[in-house]
């Protein structure tokens, strides 16, 4: 009898919880319509995988790409709407969050074509790969709009877990397994450190979890200038440093870049940074509003270390992917300048603009590496020697993307860095901008060294990989070249038409 009553109570409680969740989704679902499109795409992928055979593989790419494009369209239609807080304060919709969501969707849309031929050559399971990519995208989008500590952590872990699975997707590759283990351990440690910092915020604010309510709670408890806030700031900054690959928390990055499948590295190299930047900007600017001087100093130190170490270590690399790993550490150091400047002097606008340019430059470079790797099977920088003689289009595309990463005019990277450094200079960050300029010149050296190899015509320097180089006959390589062409064009001309981009970026205020 007692068991029967307890069972009835359990059913009633479960029904109430379900009805409450259904009510929230029914009345708040329109606020996460782009995310709902991705969820529908995920369900559709699973259904087709269960009911079809391998002959329907093109449908998997079509459904994934279409759901991403429709999600971008839905996001653009919602642009300039009034800021809304939904799901009982757990999720916020505003221009600032939406532009980061747009960048994540753009990254995923460009990355899927890069994976087509790679998956066919390595015989990877296509459905699971696309499911992980879409789920990671979904986690990144929720992270951009998360408005409380719990939602932030859940969305961050959703993105991180999919990243770990993608990193170790080629299970037979020992380097991939090693990279995954390092990524998992370092990612788990960084998440623990981040959550420990969150627990300090929760306690000091009197039990608040919403970002704005944490500020009000700190004022009410008079803890906004206490030593506990400094402890929370240190732990959260360290956790964010791992997620952003800031020096000295960058140790996992080169190994993960080198060991993971190249399309996965392309995806993680941009989406993880965009999502982490969205989190860092909001978590530092809102709860730590009263500690701005302290976190500005911390970020300045990390930015300087990242710019110097990243670019110095990139010079000595022999692997193209490891070189790009260290280059990305230096690049994120430049972006941090925009966070430090903040809303004043268009700091956030410069950060968003540079990230848009960085997406095109970085993905364009990785598209070239994917094509070269599939046709030669090597990742060594020396093996690129003389590529221009065999494939001028690929060599020129890679050269343009590398020059744009280095910041040479008139490419997009130059205008992005110019605007970023100008905003930093206007804000009085003279030393930081000077370091950025010096390390940018340093980065041009190792990019030009690779370009010189690409264009060399001396037979003694050309390796057997390029001598035996053949364009792939597979029809699917057109998708990689299409994505590469889009990125190369964007890396070349986006900087010339910066005014509309800046106008949009300047609208992304809290």
Curated annotation (Swiss-Prot):
Catalyzed reaction equations: a plastoquinone + NADH + (n+1) H(+)(in) = a plastoquinol + NAD(+) + n H(+)(out); a plastoquinone + NADPH + (n+1) H(+)(in) = a plastoquinol + NADP(+) + n H(+)(out)
Keyword field: Chloroplast, Membrane, NAD, NADP, Plastid, Plastoquinone, Quinone, Thylakoid, Translocase, Transmembrane, Transmembrane helix, Transport
Disulfide bonds: none
Catalytic class of the enzyme: translocase
A biological process term (GO) from this entry: photosynthesis, light reaction
UniProt family annotation: Belongs to the complex I subunit 2 family.
Protein name: NAD(P)H-quinone oxidoreductase subunit 2 A, chloroplastic
GO molecular-function term, one example from the UniProt record: NADH dehydrogenase (ubiquinone) activity
Taxon lineage: Eukaryota, Viridiplantae, Streptophyta, Embryophyta, Tracheophyta
Location(s) in or outside the cell: Plastid, Chloroplast thylakoid membrane
One family name in Pfam for this protein: Ndh2_N
Originating organism: Hordeum vulgare
Recorded topology in the membrane: Multi-pass membrane protein
EC number: 7.1.1.-
Cleaved signal peptide residues: none
A GO cellular-component term linked to this record: chloroplast thylakoid membrane
Role, per record: NDH shuttles electrons from NAD(P)H:plastoquinone, via FMN and iron-sulfur (Fe-S) centers, to quinones in the photosynthetic chain and possibly in a chloroplast respiratory chain. The immediate electron acceptor for the enzyme in this species is believed to be plastoquinone. Couples the redox reaction to proton translocation, and thus conserves the redox energy in a proton gradient.
